Amino acid sequence: MRCLGKRAETIFRKLIEGLNEPGDHRKIDNTGGTFMPVSIDVLGVERKTIEGREWYEMTVSLAHNYVQNGDLMADPDVEFCATPLGVAPLSFQQDPGIYRRWAWQENGQWRFHPRGQADLAMFCNQWMVNIKQQQFDTAQRTFFPAPTTEETEA
């Protein structure tokens, strides 16, 4: 299965920094509406010990979303599997009506469509670079803006 390249993986891991449990999420919008915000959701985490080493598989969704006629639309929504060894894209959704699952688990083993999953990984390598270019706050050198006064007082 094809993983993200090093540059894209670094960006991905920065985006999910601090998100560790199912249900953890964040929205990054540093452009004031110029570009679509990025929504990040932890869908699941499986932790186990293999040969005395801690191991995890974290399933994460990264998405650009918009509302059309009251419905939340994906533009796109990509599901990833992150492990200590790398980050691999699993599925792609683009509304209206496009959904492709290129990698899945079957009886505890990973199965994947080689060409489709590799194409998705290539797309995601560029998408991570685009997200960084669009959402990285160069003044603060972070994806995450400083908390507002209201956030620090709460």
What annotation goes with each model-predicted range?
Residues 1, 148-154:
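Short intrinsically disordered terminal tails
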Residues 1-36:
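N-terminal "first-domain core" detector
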Residues 4-7, 32, 54, 112, ...:
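Non-membrane alpha-helical secondary structure
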Residues 72-142, 154:
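An exposed acidic His-Trp-rich patch
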